[in-house]
Amino acid sequence: YGQNKQVLSIGRVQTPTLALIVNRQLEIANFVPKQYWELKTVYRDTTFSAIIRKSEEELILEAEKNKEAIAAGKKPKKEEENRGIDPIASQEQGAALLEQIRNSPFAITNVTKKEGKEAPPRLFDLTSLQVECNKKFAYSADETLKIIQSLYEKKVATYPRVDTTYLSDDIYPKCPGILKGLRDYATFTTPLDGTTLLKSKKVFDNSKVTDHHAIIPTGQYPQNLTDMERRVFDLIARRFIAVFYPDCKFATTTVLGVVEEIEFKTTGKQILEPGWRVIFGTPGAQSQEEKDPGEEENVLPAFVKGESGPHVPDLYEKWTQPPRPYTEATLLRAMETAGKLVDNDELRDALKENGIGRPSTRAAIIETLFKRNYIRKEKKNLIATSTGVELIQIIHEELLKSAELTGIWEKKLREIEKKTYNAAQFLEELKQMVSEVVMSVLSDNSNRHITIVQAVQEATADGKNGKAAKEKDASKPKRQSKPRKKATEAKPVTPVDGASQTGNIQTDATQTDSVEGQVCPLCGKGTIIKGKTAYGCSEWKNGCTFRQAFGSE
């Protein structure tokens, strides 16, 4: 499908990963924004939002999430009464509601306050460290891997290529010594001196550790670190110290109000005891991967049930938003939790532990997609090039580009480990699948070709990533840059003879495939089929070696 004998690589890890990016890109391209309105009012300098009744779709989604939580052994979310007004789909509907409540008093109907605890963030495995570094410092997964590998070689951090966030019990007695070695963090480690360190099951669990434990400092004083290394070491050190601090205690307040039978709601959060949050500075500056928008501290005034008074209502125009493009951080998470991309429960379970790829190989997979010019970077966003998009669209075998194939193989490999599945049978199945895929490609007579994207890579003055590469048609070379470090200039691609401006082969209408469909002259059983570069026999997988170059008939 390539041009000028260009090799287009696929693989059970790189192709599903590319498909994630392409499918997200197509979702964004095909997204049609919908207009809606929000009714809000301000009472005592606090903004309340009208409660909107959930749609049938939202209720089904919540039920599915609860099922997944139960299956994972977690407590499902408590079902709430589905009340409130219907979604405001038109400005006229919103204006009528606004007039209905404008001159009536706002009354507080309920005030609830709940206290809760928040445990420290988990220690780092390789993927979570790569995610955090991409979010905080815009480091690529490959850059982070090289940095943490360097820290390991300098003996200031433990083995990096790990997929667990836990420590084994035998590490616990060593922790006081490690903390003592973190001299630059004495402000945080001194309060722990002479105390019995917390030993949480969320940190120390032998059953969650195999060959290596989570990434932590070794206790050796870091010297001669680069700025990038120091930043990454700081993340690791603070995470490690935080797990020995008490939970953060907070209070969540929910206040309900009503105007003319239309219910309103607001929530607030107050930090009671910061606990481990002091390690990360301000309460909102903790280093957690996924933070809810309403997680910042928001202290509400003291409301009393039954109070009422004037308010200022307003109507706000809103538009539904498309999904966000993948960044390296969100792509790594998607690769890790690929179980969400398949419907089969057994396959999902197999993927929970392994995802797409392994922690130690995911950075290399993303780099491969860059090197193949399947993706490029625009700021932090990963964008599929025309080559990447067309490659995914041209692959007919869904298994090759879905997380399901990885799940099937991982599941069977686990069964082989347990001696409940035959390894020889697994190999035969792989051979059969490969034969079928190859036959499918050989019998594809569509003459479709993929636009080969070339890029000129430039390095900026400080040696960091340059501008994002732009695509260029095979017959229209354009000089542009791509965010890789090495400065290399790509040669323009010359279209193959007969190629159109779009890269598709133009065939003469008078040409006919005179041999295609005839009985194979070598084995006498199969029929001649048209391959990519020559004619072959349909019985090739059974050993027939017939081959005839194009134009020699």
Summary of predicted features, one role per range:
Residues 50-53:
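Beta-strand/loop nucleic-acid-binding surfaces
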Residues 136-140:
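A conserved hydrophobic secondary-structure block that centers on an alpha-helix together
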Residues 30, 74-81, 94, 112, ...:
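Basic, low-complexity terminal or inter-domain segments flanking catalytic cores
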Residues 69-71, 76-122, 130:
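Metal- or metallocofactor-binding catalytic centers and their adjacent structured scaffolds
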Residues 1-43, 114-117:
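C-terminal or mid-to-C-terminal helical accessory/interaction module adjacent to the motor/catalytic core
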Residues 154-157:
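Eukaryotic nuclear/nucleolar intrinsically disordered, charge-dense low-complexity regions
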